[in-house]
């Protein structure tokens, strides 16, 4: 069973993603705290991380968390898809530089999300 970690400060966004991915039979683990992501990845061992760029009132941001994951031997091989409401070329470039496998713009539809995950994980 595929496991996806959803890290987003929006309860609503996490719920939408959970419903979408659960409909595929995938296991979903969640956090609204960016600082908790590295430990979640080490313990839950997800196949993929969906990581928001901006966490209101929190430091680090999603870019920092992605860099942390990619810099740690235990978590570097877990693919990350960054999620953002901002369509700025600089953000897309920073996500790639941080090691993200993809950058998905909010709002996105269920099919777009599922296809992005399947593409990154090379699933049919």
PLM-predicted stretches and their roles:
Residues 25-34, 40, 104:
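Short hydrophobic/Thr-rich beta-strand motif most characteristic of the beta2 strand and flanking loop
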Residues 39, 61-76:
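Short amphipathic alpha-helix used as the core "switch/output" element in two-component signaling
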């Amino acid at each position: 069973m595929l496991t996806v970690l959803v890290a987003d400060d929006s309860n609503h966004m996490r719920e939408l993603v959970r419903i979408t991915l659960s409909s595929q039979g995938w296991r979903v683990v969640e956090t609204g705290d960016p600082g908790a992501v590295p430990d979640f990845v080490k313990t839950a061992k997800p196949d993929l991380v969906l990581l928001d760029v901006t966490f209101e009132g929190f430091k680090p941001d999603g870019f920092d968390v992605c860099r942390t994951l990619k810099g740690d031997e235990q978590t570097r091989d877990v693919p990350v898809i960054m999620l953002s409401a901002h369509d700025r070329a600089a953000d897309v470039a920073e996500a790639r530089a941080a090691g993200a496998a993809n950058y998905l713009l909010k709002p996105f539809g269920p099919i777009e999300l599922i296809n992005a995950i399947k593409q990154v994980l090379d699933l049919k």
